[in-house]
Amino acid sequence: MEQIGKVFRQLRESRNISLRQATGGQFSPSMLSRFETGQSELSVEKFLFALENISASVEEILFLARGFQYDTDSELRKEITDVLDPKNIAPLEDLYRREYQKHAHSQNKQKHILNAVIIKSYMKSMDERVELTAEEGKVLHDYLFSTEIWGIYELNLFSVSSPFLSVPLFTRYVREMVRKSDFLMEMSGNRNLFHTILLNGFLASIECEEFTNAYYFKRVIEEHFYKENETYFRTVYLWAEGLLDSKQGRVKEGQKKMEDAVRIFEMLGCNKSAEYYRNTTDC
């Protein structure tokens, strides 16, 4: 907490905000001063109130307090990105093995197995034969189903591991996700992941002609429908609706929706998306 107090002071002073302004009259400036110098701690409620008054976020404070280092999850993503080579899976395999070497000497074995699952998801994008071990599948299931509130970590973990799941199992996980992620849905990162997962499930269900699951995803999407500035999601959803119509015999209506979606991408200058969806449906 001493380091956090020091960082808080640096941010406050850099923005020319006094101790009194930072407390907003809700607690004494001397209390905040003692927190900044490491002489005492501050309650979470007071700390969050003061953060808001200096226009800072918890993420900024933690990033600075770690000495401009990201958290371990961000570090893992960086390690993966650094070795990622679409033509060579070996560096990812080495990273995967190293995670299990850490697992052997760690008290938090679950964390290293979940890290291994994340690494393996990138391996699967290069080699479809890659699958989770029975232990990895169990740890993934137990973690997600025992966590009562899904935040950005859980949504990301589920999203990257989805290629390992059948459509029925994916749908079961999504039912859990919907129940457990509403609390944090308005955070932009969470919302984007949430909608990406739903769209992926909707499309996968349609392509496999599992229409009961497809209509479940359609209902959940419409219950959490996209804001006006979420144009990409809206357009892909329009295209997916067209695919569903076509698969169920409403070919003319479906083709029109898919062609409309491609035209929207073209008008917005999203040429790669337009080309992808045009080629997928031969519009």
What are these regions (language model features)?
Residues 96-104, 138-145, 178-185, 218-227, ...:
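Amphipathic alpha-helical segments of tetratricopeptide repeats
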Residues 45-60:
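DNA major-groove recognition helix of helix-turn-helix/homeodomain DNA-binding modules
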Residues 100-207:
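Mid-protein regulatory/catalytic core that forms ligand/cofactor-binding pockets
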Residues 16-33:
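Short alpha-helical DNA-recognition segment
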Residues 7, 46, 78, 112-123, ...:
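"A position-specific structural signal for the A-helix of alpha-solenoid helical repeats
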Residues 63-91, 259, 263, 267:
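Short, charged recognition helix plus adjacent turn
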Residues 1-14:
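A short, Lys/Arg-rich alpha-helix, primarily the initiator
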Residues 66-77, 107-115, 149-157, 188-196, ...:
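Alpha-solenoid helical repeat architecture
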